[in-house]
Regions:
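Conserved helix-loop functional segments at active or binding sites
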Residues: 19-26, 61, 79-82, 110, ...
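Hydrophobic alpha-helical bundle architecture
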Residues: 108-126
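Secondary-structure capping and boundary motifs in well-ordered enzyme cores
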Residues: 33, 38, 65, 128-133
């Protein structure tokens, strides 16, 4: 129970909660433009032509809504740079691949270069933090987990999925504050 409480305390820390409003406030004040965003940006939500490997279309459109470019960038990086599956239980298999990070960032920026504003560009790192944070919150408070399953996830030997989000948030927290 103590690890679950620690996870909840970590995620609901006042500094983290306060940071969740930054992008939303900039959207509301029109400092950054409202865009059509997918909000579940990942490779498995793109259909490819089996002969040419060209992207044909996006799927999972139930998540499309007005939002910030930072959300799509953040979710794409969150899911795209890890060397493990999103639901990997073995923490030793969870690593960030710098080459994937560079390729995704370069590709994303090349596609939005004609529309992205300076303010939006500044929000991209926060978008990575925000989407990682949001998914960690979903994991901890998801109704798909029973109390006993949540306790299992929070056992040191079963830390897998939560640890991926927790470590990502701690890493991004560190970089946003100190780098």
């Amino acid at each position: 129970f103590e690890l679950a409480k620690d996870a909840i305390d970590f995620l609901t820390d006042e500094k983290r909660i306060g940071r969740t409003n930054i992008i939303t406030n900039k959207l509301q004040s029109k400092e950054i433009p409202l865009r059509v965003t997918h909000n579940d940006t990942k490779l498995s939500n793109i259909l490819f032509d089996k002969n040419t490997d060209e992207a044909v279309c996006l799927i999972d459109l139930d998540t499309v809504m007005p939002g910030a470019l930072a959300y799509d960038f953040g979710e794409g990086l969150r899911t795209g740079i890890t060397t493990a599956k999103e639901d990997e239980q073995d923490v030793s298999k969870i690593h960030a691949d710098i080459n994937r990070f560079e390729a995704f960032t370069k590709g994303f920026l090349s596609e939005v270069k004609d529309i992205i504003t300076e303010e939006e560009l500044e929000m991209l790192p926060l978008g990575v933090w925000m989407m990682t944070y949001e998914n960690a919150i979903r994991l901890i408070f998801s109704s798909s987990y029973t109390a006993s399953e949540l306790m299992e996830l929070c056992q040191p030997e079963m830390f897998g999925i939560f640890n991926q989000h927790d470590c990502s948030i701690r890493y991004i927290d560190f970089n946003l504050y100190y780098c």
